[in-house]
Structures are given as C-alpha cells and as structure tokens.
Amino acid sequence: DYPNTLSLSAHTHLQRNNFYGSEDGWRQQKPHHEYNAGTTSGDWYSGELDENGVPWSTMRDGTPKGYAFIRFTGNQYVIDYKAAGKPKEHQMEIYSPKVIPFGDRTSAGIFVNFFMGAKGDLVEYRIGGGDWKKMNYVEDVDPSYMALLYRWDTTDNLMPGRRPSNAVESTHLWRAGFPRDLKLGEHTIEIRATDMFGRQFVQTKTVKVQKPAEAE
C-alpha cells in the first residue's frame, strides 16, 4: 500500500545503508531502505586529538564522526552526510601507498571508503587522466582506519586520548589495483563515486612511482 518507505536507525557508532527484499521477508516490490546513520561522537570520542583538543573519533568502519541531513520532496528523499570539521565535499576517504615501484607488480591497492555508499553503487578510478575504470566492492576493514589504530600500538610513548575501537568490516569500501605501466614520477589518482541518488563526487590523491634504491 505504501511503496515509498524509509527507516532510520542509529546508535551503532558506524554507518551503513541496508536494503531489504523478498529474501528478507519484505513483501513489497521495491526494496525497503534502512539508513543507519553515523554519530556526532564517532567512535565514542576516542582516538588522537586534533589541533583543538577534540578526538578524531573516526568510527570503526572508517566513517568520520558527523551528522546527516535528509531533504524530502513529496515522497522522494536525498540524504547528505557531513563529516564534522570537513567541507561538505568530503564524501570519501582514499587510501593508497605514497610510493610504488616502477615497472613491477605490487600487492598494494587503492581503497575508497565512500561514506554514504552501499553495495551496487558505482565507484570508479583513473590515474594520470586515463580512462575511468570500475573499482571492486569489498567488505573488509578500512586500511585508513587500521593505519590510525596501529599508531597506538607502535608508538614509543603513550599519546593523549584513548585507543580507538578495533576495526569492523565496512559496507561501503571499494578496491582497485595499480597498473604496471605507470611512468616514473608523481601521478594523480582520481576517484569518482556515484551515490544511490545519482549524484557524483570526485576526490583525488597522489602517488609517486620510483625505481628502488640500489643496495649499498
């Protein structure tokens, strides 16, 4: 009777979009959307402190602390997630190595945590202005978050703040590998993510391609 539905949930201190169909017991043709919103306190105000003495508090799925806006137009809606302390354009976190070897294969990859993303969304990448290529959706821990977490385990002196929670698998993570034919020098990695509402977001990061230093 009501084909346009939306559920809102929270208090999990992570963020995800769930879609329920007939296999889940949902009896309508259009899948039911549940938006589980991230929190303003993030990971319970854990983590290192920023320049204002406020914990970074990235959530354990890699989503930054923040808040959401929902705009309704009739029976349609659009959700925007705003990372606290970041410009509204900051919709993803890109993880990649700073430098990769020239002319050789590497097991390193490019990871994109698209905060409002969900399985089935299109996330693409290109390097140095080449052709756009589709990234692979994965459900795994976010390496950006793991890098923050490992700082607490490898420091020689205890840092102010509190160690973040252990990571959980993110439901909005994508991965791609590096081609072997990149030239020496610095390259721009561009990421283009299209959300469930048809909007596109673009962010960039750089990577250097170098020859390994010769052993003395």
Segments predicted by a language model, with ranges:
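Long, low-complexity serine/threonine/glycine- and acidic-rich segments characteristic of extracellular
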Residues: 90-216
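Conserved beta-sheet core of the metallophosphoesterase superfamily
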Residues: 1-98
